[in-house]
Design a protein with these regions (language model features):
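Preference for intrinsically disordered or flexible, low-complexity segments
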Residues: 1-255
């Protein structure tokens, strides 16, 4: 899979202009999920494998502005044969036969995920306060004032990378994300986050088996930012799907 690399044209990236090739560079594998592990994913009929790829460079996307450009590939496991010994186009060669350059050297380092294994855990979370009826928001505000607890950190959106759940609207006000094909409101499919928790959510969402690790140590950093992705301003990118058909494309947010 390939996508045309977009040139950098924003202030702050001018030093990278010479690194971005005019010819295509390969899409990068970000994640893959099997229906046998996560049947909640709305796999199109006849598919049982979702592969998420993206171009590891900045693209001026309609939904988010500057971000990596994702591609969702729905496949059948039985169609996947032998694993390639060498990924296609590990090195980038220009159409005129120019010098080969490692693709990683032509990519935005914030969009190069560190390989890691998924350890699936199902949790229950509740909607962002903005998605709740007014009278419920009022009751929550009163509860927070009397208990000194935080609904957002203790009960609401689980931080970190996840499948499904609710979107957090802490950066922008909540807004609609209708399907571009049929107009149905889309729903969160996958969140890719810069970190798994933060100072506010640590007490609720930091895994118990990792709480002995001290802040600032390499061991702690590896659990806090296992993928090393940096999206937005240390934010998260969420891919939304149409509930009527996963083949209608996707919408994006960065929160």
């Amino acid at each position: 899979m390939q996508v045309q690399a977009a040139p950098f044209g924003q202030p702050g990236w001018l030093t990278m202009l010479d690194r971005v090739p005019e010819s295509p560079i390969p899409m990068l594998g970000v994640a893959q999920f099997y229906a046998r592990d996560i049947p909640e994913i709305p796999f199109p009929e006849g598919t049982d494998l979702l592969q998420v790829l993206w171009c590891p460079n900045e693209h001026d996307l309609e939904d988010t502005g500057l971000a990596p450009a994702p591609l969702l590939v729905w496949r059948r496991v039985t169609d996947v044969a032998d694993v390639l010994a060498e990924p296609p186009m590990r090195d980038h060669t220009t159409p005129d036969g120019g010098t080969e350059t490692p693709v990683a050297d032509l990519s935005h380092e914030d969009y190069l995920p560190r390989p890691c294994v998924l350890h699936l855990e199902r949790v229950t979370e509740y909607p962002d306060p903005e998605e709740l009826p007014g009278h419920v928001q009022t009751a929550l505000n009163a509860w927070e004032d009397s208990s000194e607890h935080s609904y957002q950190y203790l009960l609401s959106i689980a931080p970190g990378c996840k499948i499904g759940g609710w979107e957090s609207w802490h950066v922008t006000d909540m807004y609609e994300l209708p399907c571009d094909v049929c107009g149905t409101e889309t729903e969160p499919l996958l969140k890719l986050a810069s970190s798994e928790w933060d100072g506010g959510s640590e007490s609720r969402w930091r895994p118990l088996e990792e709480r002995h690790l001290e802040w600032g140590t390499p061991e702690c950093e590896e659990t806090l930012e296992p993928t090393t992705l940096q999206l937005g301003r240390h934010a998260a990118l969420t891919i939304f799907l149409c509930p009527r058909s996963a083949e209608h494309g996707y919408r994006l947010t960065i929160q």
